[in-house]
């Protein structure tokens, strides 16, 4: 009988043991819990996300240069080659976004340089002098891997438009002034980029136009940096869609060029 009582008491103790232990005064015992990772909180790096490591400065010396189809679509006005709002300067955000997509930080000189040139009482031919101050100040304050002065060519559609695979693009041309000591660097840079663009979309670049002599600038502020380019982005007849497609090709080519250096 005593053995049976001991056995029953033993079973009772086994049953009560977890309850007794749970009531013992261990530090913060009542707050102990198992931390289970929440799968929804896990963040994975996207393979498409590229952290910017290169910097590009964008300038628009002739900021009022306009594209006829864009002006007509947005204002109803036809045959307009210059506009104070609907112009190449208004494309800067689109260009910055395409550079960003390629992992390149692009910064525009956020000044309407054509308006500034007029405010200073200067003629159209003096626009590069006006732009020079702003470009030089930026280069002095920050370091850029590339400086681009964007323009719109005055050439017509036949010269500035490419149709490839049923898709139309605005052609680009690179202008290099030969009347300064660093022009060989600018020329080499322009030729490399032109070649890369044509490898991506054959014929999209019209090549490099060399400028010197009378009635041309001959420098185009390219003496400020050996990594400075002047790019004619399409012509007066190119559409916004054509310019957008070309901007995607241009920024991809620039990304390849910067990565190779």
Language-model-derived ranges and their functions:
Residues 184-210:
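Active-site-adjacent substrate-binding region
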Residues 51-122:
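Active-site histidine-acidic residue metal-binding/catalytic motifs
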């Amino acid at each position: 009988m005593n053995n049976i009582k001991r056995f029953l008491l033993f079973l009772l103790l086994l049953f009560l043991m977890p309850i007794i232990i749970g009531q013992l005064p261990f530090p913060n015992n009542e707050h102990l819990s198992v931390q289970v990772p929440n799968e929804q909180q896990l963040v994975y790096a996207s393979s498409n996300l590229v952290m910017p490591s290169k910097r590009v400065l964008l300038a628009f010396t002739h900021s009022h240069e306009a594209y006829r189809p864009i002006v007509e679509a947005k204002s109803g006005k036809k045959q307009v080659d210059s506009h104070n709002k609907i112009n190449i300067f208004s494309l800067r955000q689109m260009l910055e976004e395409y550079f960003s997509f390629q992992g390149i930080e692009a910064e525009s000189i956020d000044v309407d340089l054509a308006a500034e040139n007029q405010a200073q009482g200067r003629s159209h031919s003096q626009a590069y002098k006006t732009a020079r101050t702003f470009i030089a100040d930026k280069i002095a304050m920050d370091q850029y891997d590339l400086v681009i002065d964007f323009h719109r060519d005055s050439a017509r559609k036949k010269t500035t438009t490419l149709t490839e695979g049923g898709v139309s693009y605005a052609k680009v041309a690179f202008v290099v002034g030969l009347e300064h000591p660093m022009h060989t660097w600018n020329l080499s840079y322009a030729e490399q980029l032109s070649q890369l663009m044509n490898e991506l979309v054959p014929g999209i670049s019209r090549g490099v136009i060399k400028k010197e002599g009378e009635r041309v600038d001959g420098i185009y502020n390219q003496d400020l940096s050996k990594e400075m380019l002047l790019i004619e982005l399409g012509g007066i007849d190119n559409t916004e869609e054509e310019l957008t497609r070309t901007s995607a090709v241009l920024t991809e080519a620039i990304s390849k060029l910067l990565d190779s250096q």
